[in-house]
Amino acid sequence: MSQTVSGRVMPIIAVGSVDEVRNFYVDALGFQHVMGMVGKDGQLDFCTVVLGEARVMFSRAPGGSRPSAGKQPVEIYLEVDDVDTFHNRLKKKGVAISDPLTVQWWGDRTFKVLDPNGYEIWFYTNVAEPKPPTGAKLV
């Protein structure tokens, strides 16, 4: 008997400070805070933020440790209605863009930002059919 997923996938990402990352996603990127829990120390233990249909949960890393410096092994890839408009909105807010607007070979127009823990957040709008690099083929 096969099972199907009946809802959205929501990644749970461990961070050093849930408060810091929540503020970045809400204040800088325009997500909405939908739920969280404050621990005995007055800091968020976890929170869930949404942007459109996308949901991301952040939880405090074990022992409150920060992920190691640099790029993290998980990236977040979020579709937006108009990537150019979204990009311009973030730039006007002073958000640092880590990778500029680019049309990728797979047909998405993308840009990236880094969150305070080094997680790459891609924003994209599909604009073309995939055109694999020379010598590669889609399967």
Stretch-by-stretch model annotation:
Residues 1-12, 23, 28-81, 85-114, ...:
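Vicinal oxygen chelate
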Residues 14-19:
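Short acidic-aromatic low-complexity motifs
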Residues 117:
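C-terminal catalytic core of tyrosine-transesterase DNA break-rejoin enzymes
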